[in-house]
Each structure stands twice: as structure tokens, then as C-alpha cells.
Amino acid sequence: MYRALRFSVRTALRLYFGRIDADMRSAPRPGTLLLACNHPNSFLDALLVATHLPQRMCFLARGDAFRNPIAAMLLRALYMIPVYRMSEGRARLRQTTKSFRSANKELLSGRSVLVFAEGLSVNQPGLRPLGKGAARIAAMTWKGGADIAVVPVWLEYGRFHQPFAEVALRTGTLIENGVLSAQAEALFLRGFNTVLRRRLLEMAETVSFGQVPAHGGAFRRFLLAPPALAGLLLHAPWYFAVRLLTAALTRGTIFFDSVLFGLLFLSYPLWLLLLTATGLLLGLQGWAWLVWPVVPFTLWLLNRWRRKP
């Protein structure tokens, strides 16, 4: 089930983004990992990381997303663990200590854990001040005797809220038990974040957008233009309807891209079913079922056509 869902989401991400430039070679495969990532685009960040590494993982997510009981049940089913900030009150903050223990328990059981090191997600490029979550979990795990590496992960988007955006993923030099000598907790947390910040910024320097390799140049785009236009016409009504709904649901939040992707992912089979039903009503009979392989293929061709030489 997990593998099927992971494959489906990864395929959908490849259609949603114009290009995913992923270099995850430094992450051990297999192996239990504590992944410490920057956080530019809410839940979409978790999907990108989880679908580009083979490890099964759970995620630390902002606690306010768990306020709705139904949402909380769904998020926990997706192996998400709530974490809270000081601004949400001391009672909530105490729950975060329990969340760190839960993350440590998952690591010891063999499941990798993804932590967003900045804590707060903001739709902006660059690296913000790091929180202490990743450092605290690492300290807890290492003190317990587990030899689990911390993998710095860098995520960067070419732009936000636009179709076919570029995104880059990188994994950096591992932070291993023993890299930081035994220290008092405050010194350890500060030293850990100093090392993590340096390695995240090293990865950021390797990202360059707009340099997509073109194959065939202008002639290739000429050949792709007719099916790409078909892909645009077949998908535009569905896409813009879902986009308008997403804008209404996420007004004033940073969840636009995440909710848009989620709604597109869930509603796409319904859109294909509607197109199939339309074909049957028009008397196309068996030909109508070609919607299922052909229409997604035209979307893929539209994505490729947009890569200008």
C-alpha cells in the first residue's frame, strides 16, 4: 500500500512540476535516517522528500494543522507527528517534548524521521533561523546509544503558486554521532545547529534554475506543439476550477501549493472519468476509454513542451 501510494504521488509530482532536480546520493540506502530539511512550502516539502528516498518515514508537522479532529486523524494516519511553538502556550509546548520522544521511538524502531529544521514554513527563498527540534531529537537518539546519521536536506522552488515550477532537492554531508563532542545540552544544541546551517547553505549554492537541458531545440517544440495544445485544452477547465477552489480555501495561509496539489491529485481520476463519460455520451464507445492513457500523456507532453531551448 505504501509503495503504491508513494509511486502514485511521485508520478503526480512529476506532472505537477516542470522539473524536479534531485541529487540525493549522499543519503545512505538503506538505513534509518534523521532528515533535517528547510521548509519553504508546507506539506508539499514532505511529499517531495518522502517520494525521492526509499526509506519509509514519519514527519514532524506544525501543531495547528491538528486542531481539526478529522484532519488530525488523517495526518496521524500519514505518520505525521505534531510539534508546537512557544507562541501556542506552555501546555502545547509540553506536548512537543512528547512528540520528540515519539520521533525517537520511531527512529529506534527503524522508521526514518523527517524534521523541518526551521520550524516555520514561509514561501520565500533562503534559509531562516533554525529551531532546536532536529538537534533535540539527535541528542536524544545519540544519548540512547543509537548510531543514526542526520542527513541535511535542501529544498528550493523556482517559484511559488505557479504551474510547472522547478524544484531542487539535495542531500548534504552527513552529521554523525561523534561529529560534535560530548557537551552540555545548550552547547550541543548550538553547535549542532551551526554545523547543520553550514551544510544546508553549502547545498543551496549548488542550485541553479532555468538551465533545463533541451533535446532537439525548436524543431522538437514544433513537433510537440499539437499534442501539447490538446493537453492544455483537455486540462484547463479542471485545473482552473480546482485552483479557484484552492485560493478560497487557503486565503491568508501558506498552504496554497500543498492544497492545490492534494486536490488535483485526488480529483484527477474524477476528471478522467468525466471525460470518459462525455466520450461515451458522444457515441465513441470503446474509444472513450482511451482517455485514461492518452489524456495524462498529453499533460506530460505539455510539460515537456514548456522546456524552451
How should these model regions be labeled?
Residues 1, 45, 63, 205-222:
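Compositionally biased, charge-rich terminal segments
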Residues 2-9, 14-175, 229-231, 240-309:
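Soluble catalytic domains of membrane acyltransferases
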Residues 179:
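Short His/Asp/Glu-rich catalytic/ion-coordination signatures at enzyme active sites or charged loops
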Residues 182-214:
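Long, charge-rich alpha-helical interaction segments
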Residues 218-237:
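Transmembrane alpha-helical segments and their cytosolic interface motifs
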